[in-house]
Amino acid sequence: MKHQNPSKRLLRLSIKYLLAAAAVVLTYFAVIYILFSLAGTSYRSAAHVLLFAVVFLVLGLCFEPFERLMIHSFTFFKTGKRLFILLAGIVQLLFLWMTAHTTDQLISDIWLSTTEEMIVAAVFLILDKCNSALPS
């Protein structure tokens, strides 16, 4: 087996993680750009849509622990499986809407109506559910 220099190994690993992060951001950008085009959303430039995608991703990562905590709190109630799934979906949709709304408020060069914010949240909820249904 060939031994690598630790700095080269670290560089290769860093490049892999950077490429993976870029793929995630570009996927978010593509989905949001397509949604904005279909919904007729007004925005100043594609760079603002990219900024929206990055802020949406970061805020989503910040809000996710609170979303998971709220969903986990439903286990303390004696609810049926269907009601639990419904409540979890509602909480996920509301947190995604809160992320889209907060991102819209932070970026002044994109003008989203509340309906468009809910469409963004619903699309990302559907994508999340489709992704979680795939085998690992």
Curated annotation (Swiss-Prot):
Signal peptide: none
Taxonomy, superkingdom: Bacteria
Gene of this entry: yvrL
Main location: membrane
Recorded topology in the membrane: Multi-pass membrane protein
InterPro entries, sorted: YrvL
Transmembrane segments annotated in the record for this chain: 18-38, 46-66, 83-103, 106-126
UniProt-annotated location(s): Cell membrane
Entry keywords, A to Z: Cell membrane, Membrane, Repressor, Transmembrane, Transmembrane helix
Inducing factors: Expression activated by ComK. Positively regulated by SigO and its coactivator RsoA.
A single cellular component GO annotation: plasma membrane
UniProt function note: Negatively regulates RNA polymerase sigma factor SigO-dependent transcription. Prevents the expression or secretion of OxdC under nonstress conditions. May act as an anti-sigma factor.
Phenotype of the disrupted gene, per the record: Cells lacking this gene exhibit a slight increase in OxdC accumulation under acidic growth conditions and a huge increase under nonstress growth conditions.
Name of the protein this chain belongs to: Membrane-bound negative regulator YvrL
Keyword S-adenosyl-L-methionine on entry: no
UniProt organism field: Bacillus subtilis (strain 168)
